[in-house]
Every structure is written in structure tokens, then in C-alpha cells.
């Protein structure tokens, strides 16, 4: 347990574990935050310098710096010029007040039944928290804390006007979206907004399969029947859509999830024509998933931009990929013809995103920080994609594996030739400490077989240094899965 001369007696009650699936900087952040909440690290305590703490803990300076920046962004620490980081005053617990009791120990699990620790996180929802702009975000929030006390009062349920204006301008420039700020609604997550939208929809909804299971669940939970329609090389099948009774179509045209297909301009025009044949009785929900991360080609304009502000398209997007899932800010552009119904149903609702977070994002966008941040992310993620692709092509022979979905988003598909059963691949992934999904996991009908043996590999949270080892581990688990299935 490290202790530092010249500072308050400080120690970590939880040792850092390099073998854990939780990154070291997050382990350090959690441990220090717990000490501050408990009052062990008292208000006004000056934290050790980054190099000194890094040496004490045998970790990199970047690990300590990231943990400190996370603590500062969340208000645990304050940074003073030439004085380093200090524990915030208001964190001290009143005398006599005890911190919350630690949760009871979990029920013991027999070692033979315990899942091996995850060593390679290739899940599709991961992002790299090390790319989060901690310094800029913390500075903008600090400025707001001192200059905008009105943010403590209730705001517009649709979202703060400044953020809706900033989003309207950003979307017009970078996604071709045509809307007024009045058409924008801000909420705590895409699923939340979709749930509010569902009661306004005119009938059954077509959803893609393979596709996003949460979208189907949210729609059905809110009384909208879903029709699961197939995806081909150009996206949702228009033949299947035209033959269905769907009045709504939920699509991910910029980066179909999970296949990675981009819907071409011709298919987009056909989809808009499908909706235009029944004005006011058909709508398209455009989930602009991963449109920010297009590495090798220019993005097509949004469907909403093609249809216009008066068109039948509801545009959905979120900051969970471009910033972080914990930011919990998503937004929706409503067609003008739905504004009246929205206001009538939700005018007494309260907003679900804090005003400080909204104003911070507004300033982050209008100050030009967001576009620079995205450029930095694209560079980092493209390099990581290239490293993972190179690792896969080194570990697998060309006749063993086909890669797809490489040009957009933060995941790719790896289709095995003559694959073992998906159940064997799942078991082997668990055994070898790999967190990933299979394309069949996103089959919403439960009947498709063409997706068998296709791994869906996310690289958003995969450290650059682990790409080569990840390729080798994937080769081992595929070999083990094949051997296990051959013995059955």
C-alpha cells in the first residue's frame, strides 16, 4: 500500500490487478474515488504527483494521469496550477456520518464453475475511454459551474435550447440533416427516445434481421408489433418491406448493425418512395449508428437530409460512441407532422439529461472541440482496425477466414470457412477469455442459418498493444471449437 511523505497519509485499500479485465487506470480511479467518498482521503488533501504515484504503483504515468483526469471531470479532484491535484472541499462527509456499507460478499463460486477472466474485450459496445477529452470537458464544466447558476433550474423537456441549436447546426453541416432546433428532442439514451416515439407511430414496424435486438424490444414493449425483415448486400430488403404490412421502418443505413453494410443511394431513394406512397401513414426511423466512424470513403448524406424537414423520417443518434456511454445523451429529429402529437403527449414531462451536461456538450460542439475530437478518434480507431486486421491475416490462412465490414464503425465481421457450430465457438470464447459475439446472436427470427460461424469483433475498447495477441487467441479458440465439435 503506497504512502507518500509530505502528503496526508493516503493508501489504497484495493490493490491494482494487472491481470484484471478492468483497465488499470479505471481500477485506480475507482479505488481513489472510494477513498474520497469514505473520507479516508480528506477534503483539501494534495494528491501525489503523477510520476511519483506511478513509480509507487509500478504503473505508467499515463495510467495515473487518466485516473486523475477522470476524477477531476467528475468533481472529486480540482487541478491548481503548479500545485497539482487536490481533493475537492465538498467531498468531506459531515462528522458522524458513516459512508454506505460495502455490499455483502457474493456467494462463493466453485473454481470449476467460475468463468475465466476476460482478457480480450471484443464486444461491440466498447469504446476507448482513454480517448475521452477529460481536460476540455472538465474545463467547460468548471466554467459553467461558476458562470451559469440558472442551470440549476428546470429546463425545457425537449432539451436546452443552446444544445438543440448546436446539434441542428452540426447535423446540417456534417450529416446533411435539415431541421429547426424545435424539431430536436434530447434524452438519456436512444432506447429512451425510441420508447417515447413508439406511441406516436401508426402501425407495425419493420426491423432488420440480423439487427439491433434492443430496438425491437423497446418497440414491442411499447405496443408496436415488429416484422423482422432480411438484410441483403444493400441493407434492408425493399421487396420484403413492400410485401409486409409495416407502417414504420427502423433502419441503420449508414452502418447496418451488425453486418456493417452501407445502404446505397438508390436503395435509400426506394425506401423514401415507399414512405411517400402513404403520406402521414408511413414513417422511417433512421438510426444513424456509427456514422461518425467512416475510415476509407466519404459518408452518404442522411436519409432525413434526402427527405427534408417535412419528410417522413425520424432521425436518431447518440453520443455513446463518439464520447462515452456514460454521458447518456442521445437526440432525435422529429418530422414536422409529428411535432403536434409529441407536444400534446409529452408537454408535462421533465427532461432526462442534466442541464450542465447539455450545456457542456453545446459548448464542446460550438467551440470546435467535437469535430477535432472525432478526427482524433477516427485516426486512433483506424490504426487499431488496421492492426487487428493484420493480426487476423497473420494468424489465419486466407482460406480459413473472410473479413467484412471493414470500412465503417468500430467492429468487423470474421467469417470462418467450414466453421464449427456456433455453440462450440461461444464455449471456446468463454474458455479462452475472449468477449465477443456471433452474427447469429443478432438473428431476430431464430431461424436463419447462413450466419453460422461469423464472429462479430469490436475493437473500440481493445488496447492497441493487444491486437496481435488477440488475433492469436482467436485462432486458438477457433481451433479448440473445431476440435471440440469433432469429438461430439
Regions flagged by a language model, labelled:
Residues 127, 254-256, 321:
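Short glycine-rich anion-binding loops that position phosphate/pyrophosphate groups of nucleotides
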Residues 225, 283, 434-435:
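Residue-level detector of anion-binding/catalytic polar loops
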Residues 82, 306-342:
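Active-site PLP attachment segment
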Residues 1-142, 149-152, 337-338, 343, ...:
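N-terminal basic, amphipathic alpha-helical segments
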Amino acid at each position: 500500500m503506497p504512502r507518500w511523505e509530505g502528503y496526508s497519509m493516503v493508501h489504497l485499500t484495493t490493490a491494482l490487478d494487472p491481470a484484471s479485465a478492468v483497465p488499470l487506470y479505471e481500477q485506480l480511479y475507482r479505488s481513489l474515488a472510494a477513498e474520497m467518498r469514505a473520507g479516508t482521503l480528506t477534503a483539501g488533501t494534495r494528491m501525489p504527483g503523477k510520476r511519483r504515484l506511478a513509480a509507487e504503483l509500478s504503473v505508467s504515468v499515463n495510467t495515473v494521469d487518466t485516473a486523475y483526469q477522470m476524477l477531476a471531470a467528475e468533481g472529486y479532484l480540482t487541478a491548481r496550477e503548479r500545485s497539482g491535484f487536490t481533493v475537492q472541499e465538498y467531498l468531506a462527509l459531515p462528522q458522524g456520518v458513516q459512508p454506505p456499507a460495502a455490499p455483502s460478499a457474493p456467494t462463493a463460486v466453485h473454481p470449476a464453475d467460475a468463468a475465466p477472466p476476460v482478457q480480450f474485450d471484443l464486444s461491440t459496445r466498447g469504446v476507448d475511454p482513454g480517448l475521452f477529452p477529460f481536460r476540455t470537458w472538465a474545463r467547460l464544466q468548471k466554467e459553467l459551474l461558476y458562470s451559469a447558476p440558472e442551470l440549476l433550474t428546470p429546463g425545457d423537456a425537449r432539451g436546452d435550447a443552446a444544445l438543440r441549436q448546436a446539434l441542428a447546426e452540426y447535423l446540417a453541416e456534417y450529416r446533411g440533416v435539415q431541421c429547426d432546433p424545435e424539431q430536436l428532442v434530447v434524452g438519456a439514451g436512444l432506447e429512451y427516445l425510441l420508447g417515447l416515439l413508439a406511441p406516436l407511430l401508426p402501425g407495425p414496424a419493420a426491423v432488420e434481421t440480423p439487427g439491433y435486438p434492443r430496438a425491437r424490444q423497446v418497440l414491442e414493449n411499447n405496443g408496436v408489433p415488429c416484422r423482422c425483415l432480411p438484410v441483403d448486400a444493400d441493407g434492408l430488403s425493399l421487396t420484403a418491406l413492400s410485401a409486409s404490412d409495416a407502417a414504420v421502418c427502423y433502419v441503420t443505413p449508414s452502418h447496418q448493425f451488425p453486418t456493417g453494410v452501407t445502404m446505397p443511394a438508390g436503395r435509400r431513394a426506394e425506401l423514401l418512395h415507399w414512405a411517400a406512397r402513404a403520406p402521414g401513414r408511413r414513417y422511417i426511423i433512421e438510426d444513424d449508428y456509427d456514422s461518425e466512424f467512416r475510415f476509407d470513403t466519404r459518408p452518404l448524406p442522411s436519409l432525413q437530409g434526402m427527405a427534408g424537414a417535412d419528410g417522413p423520417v425520424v432521425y436518431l443518434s447518440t453520443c455513446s460512441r463518439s464520447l462515452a456511454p456514460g454521458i447518456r445523451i442521445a437526440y432525435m429529429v422529429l418530422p414536422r407532422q409529428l411535432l403536434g402529437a409529441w407536444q400534446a403527449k409529452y408537454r408535462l414531462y421533465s427532461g432526462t439529461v442534466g442541464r450542465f451536461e447539455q450545456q457542456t456538450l453545446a459548448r464542446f460542439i460550438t467551440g470546435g472541440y467535437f469535430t477535432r475530437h472525432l478526427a482524433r478518434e477516427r485516426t486512433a480507431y483506424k490504426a487499431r482496425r488496421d492492426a487487428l486486421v493484420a493480426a487476423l491475416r497473420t494468424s489465419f490462412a486466407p482460406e480459413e477466414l473472410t473479413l467484412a465490414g471493414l470500412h465503417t464503425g468500430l467492429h468487423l465481421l470474421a467469417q470462418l470457412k467450414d466453421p464449427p457450430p456456433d455453440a462450440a465457438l461461444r464455449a471456446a470464447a468463454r474458455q479462452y477469455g475472449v468477449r465477443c459475439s456471433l452474427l447469429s446472436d443478432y438473428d431476430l427470427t431464430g431461424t436463419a442459418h447462413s450466419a453460422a460461424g461469423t464472429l462479430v469483433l469490436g475493437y473500440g475498447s481493445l488496447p492497441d498493444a493487444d491486437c496481435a495477441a488477440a488475433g492469436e487467441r482467436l485462432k486458438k479458440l477457433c481451433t479448440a471449437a473445431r476440435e471440440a465439435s469433432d469429438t461430439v
